[in-house]
Amino acid sequence: HPEKIESLKDSFKKNKSPEIENIESEKKIFVANSFEVHTKKIIALKDKTAFVIYPKDQKNFNKEKLKIYTQNGFVIENFQQKKLDLPKYFTLQRNGGIKTIISIEENKIALISGSENNCFFASLILLKNGNELMRTKCLPEDLKNNDFNGLGSSNIHLDDFLYLTLGTPEKHISKNSPLAQNNKYLFGKVLKIKKSDVIKKIDNQTETLKIDIFSKGHRVPQGLTRINDSIFNVEHGPKGGDELNLVIENGNYGWPLVSYGTNYLKENGGDGKSINFNHDLNNFNEPLLALVPSIGISSLN
């Protein structure tokens, strides 16, 4: 009974406090083609992190000021753990959990995965009281084929708007894939939300949060950043075809109809079939860069 096993693992992980260790390692230097990166280990954390926040007004780095959110629903500050106030439907099943943290004024909002009455979905939760600000429709795929690693997990602010990525949570092409082209669903999109509307929803739970689709046809858009007034994202392809995109309003990036990757082979749950790869000929936005084979692309800074 794989779903029972998933449920047991979910219950155990949600109640397991993160293990954190204050350490200080020697500095290491990693050399690339045109730059080098100096690193040293300052914290050892065995649990998956969802987001790290550091106050921008700090002149000298102090790791005790780090606020670390873990995927299983804890926040760590000054090396002290605290369990977050999350709804009962919050789930870690199928690689779920907290996927990103959004800051609007003094409010912290979590994008989380949820499970209720055989329905997997995503929602936005106000962390100070656990109130739900938004909930997606149910994912149509069989429970065992969902994979919340594909939910996406990135947000940026530009002018008066919040931009948030939601992917199609799946291991391989499935019933979830076409949602990226379906405007009735939020999955497979870059979403645009007016920040003042979020504040209205926080102040009045009866308000409906207005969410616009900025772009669509995204598979797993895990990285989002802005350079001046331009928005860029990186996303996972299937087997090959990771992408760097310039994201424009009303752009359609083609998933699952086009990709420079292919379906996974049968031993990985796919059928091994190729996918149309020419975006432009099929009236979709071409990526700035497509990577074959995949590099497991994630964040973009």
Indicate where each model-derived feature is located.
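Acidic, Gly/Ser/Thr-rich repeat motifs that build Ca2+-stabilized beta-propeller blades
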Residues: 2-170, 223-237, 293-301
